[in-house]
Amino acid sequence: MGINLAADSRVFIIEGISGSGKDTFQTYLKEQLEGPHLYDYSEGEVLHSWKHLQIEGILKLRIKFMKLFVNYVSDIVSRDENAVFLLNRFHLSAYVSTIIQQPKLKREYDDIINVLRTLPIHVFILQLDENEIEERSLHPERSSAWQKHQQQIVNKEGFRDRLERYLWQQGLMLEAAERQQIPYSVIKFPCALENGTRIASWT
């Protein structure tokens, strides 16, 4: 599976459910795009870490931050023709985790989407087959606090188990991506790297 992006794509967003390989794919893309004008952001740096979710008011704060952030990205990209942004989670994760939970934030969210549509952007949606989700989403290397948090979320949101929740999230992300009409690719990861994914280079 080869992917060759046009050189005018300068904002890259990696999306996908927990366990889909976002961190690994971000590391790979960072190696391909490495340079003095690369702005690289982890999920925590864009307020999408699981550690934020139990903070009261975080969903509203996240949307406010995202509005400021997209304007910042737009400004940098317009002023520096060599600037490239690489984000781990952003608008699709926000839709699944924030807008579905608090629909009253949708107007501000739509403002974010409108700015994203004006940018030279490409979104990678990492997708897992149903039989991969259970194994890859376990994250045995993560702390007991993370494991406990995941179970609390499953119970709070009324899902039968983690698999049901992640299948729902994955489908919702794809629906939102199609509706929002922001350029995107669906990638079966890690198979994509094994089969030679390639990113166009910049000069």
Model-derived features: positions:
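Walker A/P-loop
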Residues: D23
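ATP-binding Walker
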Residues: S20
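P-loop (Walker A) phosphate-binding loop of NTP-binding proteins
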Residues: I17
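Conserved substrate/cofactor phosphate-moiety recognition/catalytic segment
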Residues: T27-R79, T98-I99
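A glycine- and Lys/Arg-enriched "phosphate-lid" helix/loop adjacent to the NTP-binding pocket
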Residues: N114-Q169
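Glycine-rich phosphate-binding loop used to anchor ATP phosphates in small-molecule kinases
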Residues: R62-T118
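Hydrophobic anchor at the beta1->P-loop junction of P-loop NTPases
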Residues: I14
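NTP-dependent small-molecule kinase module
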Residues: G2, R162-T203
